Amino acid sequence: MNKWMFFCALLCLGGCASHRCDTSTRYDEPSGDSLCRSAHLLYQNDMLQAKLMISAGGSDNSELAKALLERAASQDRSGEAEFYQAVLLIRANSDNAEAIDLLERAAKRNHPLAIALLAQQLASSDAKKAEQYRANYADLDVAKSGYPSFEQALHVANGLITPVL
């Protein structure tokens, strides 16, 4: 049950990026936005595949997830791609400075999970900055609505870093 709640929270918190083209056009209707719609569908597909691979855990999928996230990053306006790229780096015990940079870029776009994880990652090295990110989280619309709390967001982010297998 806990695993399903985590997965549902992951998909719900995945981010709602706004797009400048009409993405509601059906495939059989001619539209001037068809290239934009195709690009948006590919972006959504890349993000979904990458999130599923990351949430499944294991290092087998990391390389493909990384490639999908890099391709999706060019269209991402929500900070979601940077957040998941940082998760992969943290999970691999890779370059922490690069992971922090990716999280900061995602935080600038108000990605809630990135802000929570950034506050946690900076807690030991820069407590003042970590506290500022925690305060920034409290100012997000999603936090003001009561769901998810900072602790719940950390639980989801930590679950991505060390997935339950």
Regions found by a protein language model. Name each.
Residues 13-15:
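C-terminal motif of bacterial Sec signal peptides marking the signal peptidase cleavage site
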Residues 17-19:
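Bacterial signal peptide processing site
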Residues 127-165:
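Terminal, low-structured helical/coil segments at or just beyond the last alpha-helical repeat
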